[in-house]
Amino acid sequence: VQLSWVVLYDDAGKVMQSIGFMRDLTAQHNAQKRIKELAYTDVLTGLPNRLLLSQRVETAIADAQEQSGGFAVLFLDLDRFKIINDSLGHPFGDRVLQLVAERLQTCLRQTDMLCRLGGDEFVIYLHGGNATVAEGVSRRILDEMLRPFTLDDMGFSIQCSIGIALYPHDGLSVDDLIKQAD
C-alpha cells in the first residue's frame, strides 16, 4: 500500500483541505515478481536459466578467489532427443524434459544448481565440487537416467552425455567453463 497526502492552502497560507490517497500496489508487486521469475527461470521446467547460472557462478568465482577454492560445472545433453520430438511431437518432448529435470534434481545437493540452457542442454553448478565430487554426481545421474521413464503409458529410456569442467583449472569464466565442459 502506498499512502500520499496533498495539502491545499489558501492565499494566507492557512490549511484549507488535506486529501489522502491510498494505492494498492499488490498488482504492481506481483507483476514485478513475475518479470523477475521470467528473467531468471526457464519457462518450461521452472529451473534457473543461463542468466541466473551466470550470476551464481560469478559469485562462486569471487568466493573461490578469496578462499583459494574451486567448484565444478557439468554440461549435460540428452542423446538422440531429437528423435523423441520428431516422432512423438514437441508437446511430448516438453513433458519428457520436465521429467528429466525432476530426475536430475534428485541427484544434487541443496547447494548445487541445475539449470536448463535450452533444448536438451542442462548445466549443473556443483558448489565446492572437485573432480571426485563431479565424477560421483555424474555417475549418479547416469545411473538415474538408466531407470525407465513412463509417460502416457509409454515406457522409454533416455541416455545423456556429461562433460565436466573444474574451476580454476579448466576456465576462469562461466562461458569458458561451459565451453570446456561441453
Language-model-derived ranges and their functions:
Residues 14-24:
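PAS-family sensory domains
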Residues 26, 30-33, 175:
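Signal-transmission coiled-coil "S-helix"-like helices
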Residues 3-5, 22, 159:
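Sensory-domain boundary capping and coupling elements
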Residues 29, 36-40, 46-72, 79-109, ...:
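Conserved long alpha-helical elements within nucleotide-processing catalytic cores of c-di-GMP signaling
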Residues 114, 140, 144, 150, ...:
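Cyclic nucleotide signaling catalytic output domains
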Residues 9-14, 170:
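Flexible loop/coil segments at beta-strand boundaries within sensory signal-transduction domains
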Residues 8, 63, 106-111, 143-155:
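Short catalytic/binding micro-motifs of nucleotide second-messenger systems
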